[in-house]
UniProtKB/Swiss-Prot annotation:
GO terms for biological process: potassium ion transport. Keywords: Antiport, Chloroplast, Hydrogen ion transport, Ion transport, Membrane, Plastid, Plastid inner membrane, Potassium, Potassium transport, Transmembrane, Transmembrane helix, Transport. It comes from Phalaenopsis aphrodite subsp. formosana. This is Potassium/proton antiporter CemA. It holds the Pfam family CemA.
Length: 229
């Protein structure tokens, strides 16, 4: 009976998987024009933060150095100096345009993700009954598994998420979150998150194994530690 109810709630779970993609695609198109108009009228009032300001200055200095180096090879005639100023002016305009596009995409992605989060929260709230049925079926399914399979599953999941080789996966995941919000990746922040977040998760898992599993199924804990060794 529970299995039939769980299968009946399966379309709801499938819709949860595809809903973020659909919301993101739809609202990106709907909000794009509005965000462009808002950005064009309000961008002069929005200050750059320290990281963005530093990036713009670094790009401008690199651009200036390249033009100066190119002109040093040539003769310093009046024509060449005019070309230098014209080239610098064009490249500066392009640099400002690229920076504006970067800010525009940050605002667009952030707004879309907020709307997506609000819609998903409401969807979870309205589908509370389906989630409860599916959760009951999952608990019954896991309870009927042998301790060996349970220990193997826990070991597999923990190794994938917080194991020695999980660093690259965390870098890709955090990088995808940065891209999803339209943010420029910061290697120092990503490195800090990769070095600390798995450690926190590892501590939580160890506490859960010690506090919960050791009380519910001591044999499972023994098998888990045997496999882990």
């Amino acid at each position: 009976m529970k299995k039939k109810k769980a299968l009946a709630s399966l379309p709801y779970l499938v819709s949860i998987i595809f809903l973020p993609w659909w919301v993101s695609l739809s609202f990106n198109k709907c909000l794009e024009t509005w965000v462009i108009n808002w950005w064009n009228t309000r961008q002069s009032e929005i200050p750059l933060n320290d990281i963005q300001d530093k990036n713009v200055l670094e790009k401008f200095m690199e651009l200036e150095e390249l033009f100066l180096l190119d002109e040093m090879i040539k003769e310093y005639s009046e024509t060449h100096m005019q070309r230098l100023h014209i080239g610098m002016h064009k490249e500066t305009i392009q640099l400002v345009q690229r920076q504006n596009e970067s800010h525009f995409h940050i605002i667009l992605h952030f707004s879309t993700n907020l709307i997506c989060f609000a819609i998903l929260s409401g969807y979870f709230f309205l589908g509370n009954k389906e989630l409860f049925i599916f959760n009951s079926w999952i608990q019954e399914f896991l309870y009927n598994l042998s301790d060996t399979i349970k220990a193997f599953s826990i070991l597999l999941v923990t190794d994938l998420w917080i194991g020695f080789h999980s660093t690259h996966g965390w870098e890709l995941m955090i990088g995808s979150i940065y891209n999803d919000f339209g943010l420029a990746q910061n290697d120092q922040i990503i490195s800090g998150l990769v070095s600390t977040f798995p450690v926190i998760l590892d501590t939580i898992v160890k506490y859960w194994i010690f506090h919960f599993l050791n009380r519910v199924s001591p044999s499972l804990v023994v098998i888990y530690h045997s496999m882990n060794e």
